[in-house]
Amino acid sequence: DIPFARPFIKYTPTWPRSFMPSNQAERNRVAKMKLIPVHELIEGKKLLFVDDSIVRGTQLRETVDFLYENGAKEVHIRSACPPVMFSCKYLNFSRATSEMELLARKIIFELEGEEGFKYIDEYADSSTERGQKMRDAICKEFQFSSVEYQSLDGLIKSIGIDKCKICTYCWNGKE
């Protein structure tokens, strides 16, 4: 059994979602201001943190730094959706001014340059060598003990809606 508890209180009434401000310094400030630690649940613990998505990684970077600063032994990350590979062209939800702001694309570029974008499907798949390299690079950059993403098929299955009725553009670039 893995106990479930919230190792910090996330105070959000006066702060927007951290990925929404267009300025990186403002995103960092918002991310940091929202967290209040519960030391008994952090100090000396191995933590598993689940987030809805990883867009730029702003909130996760701040959260992981915060957890280590408060004594966490390990911090493992799980994303409830696949790696975000494309900016939303329909709702502008991710608010990225460039697709290179998206963490997954940034890491792919660092690993292989423009050539890597030919292999986005492989990078999204944790069972491939490229998929594992991307995850390892993210762990190194963010000091995660591990990181995993939900697969697109797993996400669609969990939603229970026919695939043709779900927009998956930000994950696979398919309209």
Which stretches of residues belong to each language-model region?
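PRPP-associated nucleotide enzymes
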Residues: D1-E175
